């Protein structure tokens, strides 16, 4: 193909993604677009076709992004090449969304006709506008009995500033309005710009590992051409590889001769090491490199850390391999080795949020067959010590002694909640209870309010979202972004079993809530830890000071069962012997701690 043909082809390429709040019908719309462009044969068609992970289908959510090439014959007689990049909608996976958008020129904004605009709809719109994408608004599910398309149209105009007349009314499930959406894509989404003669620049927006072919990177070509046999260079690491195959996804992988300007496809270059193909890096040709890399998207930092330990210590190395493989597709996952007296060897792992954490744990157990114990998640604290040095703490067990610390800073987030009017009181009460600071309240219309609070991330991370949903009967939507670290009056709470600290049960808590949290936790542990042959005291302590205590009673064995009548001194001797035995056991005895006990720290607020 010469450059003239490449330029002509470029004019007919449309790269777009679909963005929406969770559950507004994004994956169903993607299915319909695939069907209507005849990209998938009817017999291969299944619901949520682009959600390739079993977990995604089970939970009905999209976790990983996916890219597909489609052919569409428009009414103007031309055949267009569409690249559809499917994105997740959940707040933990905003990162995946920002990666998809970096590879597009336009986005379909899907809004539910009954629910209207929600918090994550707005968050994703701002991401799209930051990437200078053209937006095509679609109101989905218009055939629902509760649908109010006219109200939602007005919302889109008022809140996002898109013209009502540009809105397409559709129902992905019933195949209504899909043809109009396809025509609008041709009309609204601009063709990619880029020069086929310039040095190669390709953005890696995703990568996965194949045990036979090495790393497969999903790329978007911005300038230049790449084909099999080319020698490529990664601009971040400077490493060079020879390309063995380039191709496109039609959802199935299909090798092609070359990828050129505007194309979205995959590249295989027998890369064995995950770190050599970093998401966000720019690929260029070794023989004719580009002068500077593409503007990559911002790296997301983990917000939540927890310890993952294999139940069987033999699996320690397998766990490392599992985490490395998951990290390849999920650049926001971080991990480093850690050891715990209670749990042995494992990894301190960083996640974007609680859903992300659950999904990674479930994938490790399911895909790699490793049974895990997870410790309570914690956020990152900055400590300024009395000698002026600073320490970063992501594990409560490593918190320095309180008398050495001058100040502790914890991360705060700005939380935006959209709530029906009737529940404003309940939501504000929840935020106050979680140490929130009220910032702003906006009445969007006569039924919904937008409430903005600044909250400590540690309070949001545990079960804030669940409590918000239950306080509003499931109607609230929620989005948050990190703002800054603020000084707080925090203390480390240690749990002692039989006088020994259990490092995996330590947690960091605000001084005002320390007594209640400590008391609630020891009472909870009393019910979870099985009774031993000897009495076990459970204590909660701040430094040297015990703030709460309870005892787990011992199991009694009747040593007098064999004494029928007879001498009291004989009985006394047996009882004294039992008592001495229990005292000895207590001095050397270890207490087995079940997995539920580690999770008890999380479920503290449910009571």
Swiss-Prot record:
SMART domains: EFG_C. InterPro entries: EF-4 (IPR006297), EFG_III/V (IPR035647), EFG_V-like (IPR000640), EFTu-like_2 (IPR004161), G_TR_CS (IPR031157), LepA_C_sf (IPR038363), LepA_CTD (IPR013842), LepA_IV (IPR035654). PROSITE patterns: G_TR_1, G_TR_2. GO terms for cellular component: plasma membrane. This is Elongation factor 4. Belongs to the TRAFAC class translation factor GTPase superfamily. Classic translation factor GTPase family. LepA subfamily. It comes from the Bacteria. GO terms for molecular function: GTP binding; GTPase activity; ribosome binding; translation elongation factor activity.
């Amino acid at each position: 193909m010469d450059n003239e043909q490449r330029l002509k082809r470029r004019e007919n390429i449309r790269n777009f993604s679909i963005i929406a709040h969770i559950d507004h019908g994004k994956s169903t719309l993607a299915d319909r677009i695939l069907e209507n462009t005849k990209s998938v044969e009817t017999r291969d068609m299944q619901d949520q076709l682009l959600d390739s992970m079993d977990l995604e289908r089970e939970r009905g959510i999209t976790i990983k992004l996916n890219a597909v090439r489609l052919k569409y014959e428009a009414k103007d007689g031309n055949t267009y090449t569409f690249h559809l990049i499917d994105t997740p909608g959940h707040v933990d996976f905003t990162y995946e969304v920002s990666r998809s958008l970096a590879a597009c020129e336009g986005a379909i904004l899907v809004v539910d006709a009954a629910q209207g605009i929600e918090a994550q709809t707005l968050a994703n719109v701002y991401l799209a506008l930051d990437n200078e994408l053209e937006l095509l608004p679609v109101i989905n599910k218009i055939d629902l009995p509760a649908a109010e398309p006219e109200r939602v149209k007005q919302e889109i105009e008022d809140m996002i500033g898109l013209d009502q007349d540009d809105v397409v009314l559709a129902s992905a499930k019933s195949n209504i309005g899909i043809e109009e959406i396809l025509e609008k894509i041709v009309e609204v989404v601009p063709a990619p710009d880029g020069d086929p003669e310039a040095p190669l620049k390709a953005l890696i927006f995703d990568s996965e590992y194949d045990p036979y072919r090495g790393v497969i990177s999903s790329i978007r070509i911005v300038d230049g051409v790449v084909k099999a046999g080319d020698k490529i260079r990664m601009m971040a690491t400077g490493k060079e590889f020879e390309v063995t195959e380039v191709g496109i996804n039609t959802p199935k992988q299909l090798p092609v001769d070359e990828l050129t300007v505007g194309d979205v496809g995959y590249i295989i270059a027998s890369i064995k090491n995950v770190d050599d193909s970093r998401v966000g890096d720019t690929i260029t040709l070794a023989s004719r490199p580009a002068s500077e890399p593409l503007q990559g998207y911002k790296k997301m930092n983990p917000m939540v850390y927890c310890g993952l330990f294999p139940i069987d210590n033999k699996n320690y190395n397998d766990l490392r391999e599992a985490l490395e493989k998951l990290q390849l597709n999920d650049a926001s996952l971080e991990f480093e080795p850690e050891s715990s007296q209670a749990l042995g060897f494992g990894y301190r792992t960083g996640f974007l949020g609680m859903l992300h954490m659950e999904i990674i744990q479930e994938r490790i157990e399911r895909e790699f067959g490793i049974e895990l114990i997870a410790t309570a998640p914690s956020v990152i604290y900055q400590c300024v010590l009395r000698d002026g040095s600073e320490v970063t703490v992501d594990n409560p067990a490593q918190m320095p002694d309180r008398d050495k610390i001058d100040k502790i800073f914890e991360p705060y987030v700005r939380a935006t909640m959209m709530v029906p009017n009737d529940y404003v009181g309940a939501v504000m009460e929840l935020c106050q209870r979680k140490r929130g600071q009220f910032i702003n309240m906006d009445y969007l219309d006569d039924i919904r309010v937008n409430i903005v609070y600044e909250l400590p991330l540690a309070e949001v991370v545990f079960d804030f979202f669940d409590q918000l949903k239950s306080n509003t009967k499931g109607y609230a939507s929620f989005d948050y972004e990190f703002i800054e670290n603020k000084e707080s009056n925090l203390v480390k709470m240690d749990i002692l079993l039989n006088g020994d600290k259990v490092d995996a049960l330590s947690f960091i808590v605000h001084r005002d809530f320390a007594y209640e949290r400590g008391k609630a936790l020891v009472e909870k542990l009393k019910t979870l830890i099985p009774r031993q042959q000897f009495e076990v005291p459970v204590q909660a302590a701040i430094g040297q000071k015990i703030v709460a205590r309870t005892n787990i009673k011992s199991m009694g064995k009747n040593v007098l069962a064999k004494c029928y009548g007879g001498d009291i001194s004989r009985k006394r001797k047996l009882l004294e012997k039992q008592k001495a035995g229990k005292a000895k056991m207590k001095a050397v005895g270890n207490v087995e701690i079940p997995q539920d006990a580690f999770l008890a720290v999380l479920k503290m607020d449910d009571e």
